[in-house]
């Protein structure tokens, strides 16, 4: 076996955490031959529940699970980690304004960014799943000045996977036949899942679908509104699918994207495709050796331009809001 990889997960006793930890421990992220050390962060009142989760992890006897440590102190849990999955976030409660949500999460991700800056491994990679993910990632990144901005990413892989599922259903294809899906922008209702560069069994997806009305009025709203639809159906938010997407995103980031394909990741914009620099914006990317690169040179039609600009504008406003709160 290779040397153990130290992985931190925040919000580890939550619903997504519960789905995520057993996948990581079973080898879904790095394979069964790479041992993992789980470092699990929770708020103090949730530590008792987290102890129960650790009991279950012990009872699974996963060969790849080297050790588990839990705690409520970020500096202790993040010490020496090479991968930090920031899953825990303050959910929006009834009557809460968006500004209140940004402020509450700002305090969480400011503290975690500073702790990662102090104690994480030099080669750390940080993926943010907790919502609002793009802006939470921006806050953490802004509070970790010694960690390169390229080491931070927010999760839009769930939207990417949802888009693949919807396109596969529409075209009667297998999900494995679909490549080059793109989700632009924010993990929110303004996101833009784009099939104009996607392929279905090697053919252009938009040409296979040949239905602009479906793209505009069914596909995009279904993908963007999927989280709300799941809450309506099961009475709780997406957990297993969010955990699965978190695994997919981390695996591809660290181990590389398949040849001839790309994935969607929210990363710090360098101005590509006219997006303001510094926004945590979802792009099509290829990855290799733990590094990502934005896919450049894609043709953007007028419809796509409007959608891409609208989601950028929302992120710009979110950045301004957290700047006004003194969080970045």
Swiss-Prot record:
Q: Which reaction does it catalyse?
A: (S)-malate + NAD(+) = oxaloacetate + NADH + H(+)
A GO biological-process term: tricarboxylic acid cycle
EC number(s) stated in the UniProt entry for this protein: 1.1.1.37
Residues annotated as binding substrate are 92, 98, 131, 162
- Answer yes or no on keyword NAD: yes
CDD domains of this UniProt entry?
A: MDH_chloroplast-like (cd01338)
Similarity annotation: Belongs to the LDH/MDH superfamily. MDH type 2 family.
- Name the UniProt record assigns to this protein: Malate dehydrogenase
